[in-house]
Amino acid sequence: MTPRRRRLGLLLAALICVGIATTLVLNAFRSNLVFFFSPSQVAAHEAPVARSFRLGGLVAPGSIRREGDGMTIRFIVTDTARQVLVVYRGLLPDLFREGKGVVARGKLEADGTFVASEVLAKHDENYMPPEAADALKQAEQVNRRMAGTPQGARQ
């Protein structure tokens, strides 16, 4: 084998190794990423079914229901435009309240119910995850347009 062919073979082997390593790294990232979706995005079928993601919004007033076992809680998360039913089995954070911000991590069932494995409540009256704040602003703009209220007008 000539030196030129040997260099070409080594270069080809190195490129194959880099390609395999890149594929493995990207696959690992894809399986560990947890995306954020608002109730409006879930209603628009933008959220994956049976794959973990975060759902954020406000706990709808009057929506918290405890099951007979005392550990299963059902509540509705809203972004003021759409609502998603959430089912969670476990202890809720102390700051979990109706009308307050919440981020739930879990999976969407085929029937549209979000089964949460973790529920996080906002930690003070001013904090809201940026994604949830953006989703609420977008939903508010949609509500204004649907109601015919000018965007700059106050209600």
Curated annotation (Swiss-Prot):
One Pfam family here: CcmE
Record-given protein name: Cytochrome c-type biogenesis protein CcmE
Gene Ontology MF: a single term: metal ion binding
GO BP, sorted A to Z: cytochrome complex assembly
PANTHER family for this protein: CYTOCHROME C-TYPE BIOGENESIS PROTEIN CCME HOMOLOG, MITOCHONDRIAL
Coiled coil, from the record: none
Membrane-crossing segments per the record: 8-28
InterPro entries xrefs: CcmE (IPR004329), CcmE-like_sf (IPR036127), NA-bd_OB-fold (IPR012340)
Record organism: Cupriavidus necator (strain ATCC 17699 / DSM 428 / KCTC 22496 / NCIMB 10442 / H16 / Stanier 337) (Ralstonia eutropha)
Protein residues bound to heme: H123, Y127
GO CC annotation terms, alphabetical: plasma membrane
Keywords of this entry: Cell inner membrane, Cell membrane, Cytochrome c-type biogenesis, Heme, Iron, Membrane, Metal-binding, Plasmid, Signal-anchor, Transmembrane, Transmembrane helix
Gene3D superfamilies: Nucleic acid-binding proteins (2.40.50.140)
Topology of the protein relative to the lipid bilayer: Single-pass type II membrane protein
Source organism, top-level taxon: Bacteria
